[in-house]
């Protein structure tokens, strides 16, 4: 299980929740959605390893299941418990959260069990990320339409980014094809372009320094693309994995930027960006790809 990346999922919840609440009130609902997201995200990681155990035995034999440290049955039970905990936490928040969580379960299992090795695999992973951000926004009354902008547009752009990331990372354990990587780069930048377009044109509820925000986003985008180009020029597994790790870390920063733009509250943005600390720290001992 690539535990460090669970904090990237939590950054989705922070952004989504603030888009519909402007603060962390009510704190119980916010906390339960963090638990729901973490449970569902980690369950997806576990089931991914369960269904990928034969491939991992060849490409990643040190992982817990192929190495024999954890049995397939034990891993499946753990994945089921995490998934139930995630759905249960969402159900406690409310009906809309339960609906989004159930959609997310379907997307997770659809990816892990059926679609991962097909051309629809990256699409489904993007849908998972889209739904995770919408889960953060879902703590609203049932009569309120959840599926509206700005959360719908932001979630779509972030989902497109993750779709491209997944495409880019599909062959990370072995030599990747340049054409494959270039395709991933194009989708990644389509998602990033959607975010930049929204930053520049959306009627944000509070006054912001657009130049500063676009400059911050530009730094993140340039950092991502530098690693992408390096991996394309030399598509060795190590370079592709570094690019993927850079994108996962940058994802948190993109969410932090959107948090600041929506709330103009630097504290909320710093809290979001602070999720980088456990991500980076744990990645020294645990895999992120």
Task: Name what the model sees in each region.
Residues 1, 52, 256:
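Divalent metal-coordination and catalytic microenvironments
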Residues 35-37, 53-108, 126, 148-156, ...:
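Multi-pass membrane catalytic core of lipid/isoprenoid biosynthesis enzymes
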Residues 40-44, 116, 218-221, 275:
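Alpha-helical transmembrane segments
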Residues 1-4, 49, 65-75, 92-97, ...:
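Short, amphipathic, aromatic/basic-enriched membrane-interface segments that mark the entry/exit
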Residues 130, 136-289:
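C-terminal membrane-associated helical module and adjoining short loops/tails
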Residues 110, 114-122:
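Membrane-interface helix-loop-helix junctions at boundaries between adjacent transmembrane segments
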Residues 9-51, 57, 83-91, 95-111, ...:
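Membrane-embedded alpha-helical segments that form the functional core of polytopic membrane enzymes
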Residues 36-74, 165-178, 282, 286-287:
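Acidic (Asp/Glu-rich) catalytic motifs at the cytosolic membrane interface
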């Amino acid at each position: 299980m690539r535990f460090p990346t669970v904090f990237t999922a939590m950054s989705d919840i922070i952004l989504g929740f603030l888009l519909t609440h402007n603060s962390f009130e009510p704190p119980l609902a916010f906390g339960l959605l963090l638990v729901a997201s973490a449970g569902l995200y980690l369950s997806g990681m576990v089931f991914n390893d369960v269904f990928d155990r034969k491939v991992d035995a060849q490409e990643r034999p040190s992982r817990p299941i192929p190495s024999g440290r954890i049995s397939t049955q034990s891993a499946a039970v753990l994945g089921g418990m995490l998934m139930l905990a995630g759905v249960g936490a969402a159900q406690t928040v409310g009906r809309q959260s339960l609906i989004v969580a159930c959609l997310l379960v379907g997307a997770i299992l659809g990816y892990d069990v059926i679609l991962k090795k097909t051309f629809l695999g990256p699409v489904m992973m993007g849908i998972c990320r889209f739904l995770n951000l919408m889960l953060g926004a879902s703590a609203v009354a049932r009569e309120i339409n959840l599926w509206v902008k700005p959360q719908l547009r932001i979630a779509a752009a972030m989902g497109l980014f993750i779709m491209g990331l997944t495409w880019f990372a599909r062959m990370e354990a072995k030599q990747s094809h340049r054409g494959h990587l270039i395709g991933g780069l194009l989708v990644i930048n389509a998602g990033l372009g959607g975010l930049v377009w929204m930053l520049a044109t959306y009627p944000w509820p509070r006054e912001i320094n657009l130049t500063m925000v676009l400059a911050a986003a530009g730094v993140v985008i340039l950092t991502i693309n530098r690693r992408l180009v390096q991996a394309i020029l030399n598509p060795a597994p190590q370079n592709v994995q570094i690019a993927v790790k850079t994108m996962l870390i940058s994802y948190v920063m993109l969410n932090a930027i959107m948090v600041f733009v929506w709330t103009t509250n630097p504290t909320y943005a710093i809290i979001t960006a602070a999720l980088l600390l456990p991500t980076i720290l744990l990645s020294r001992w645990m895999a992120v790809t």
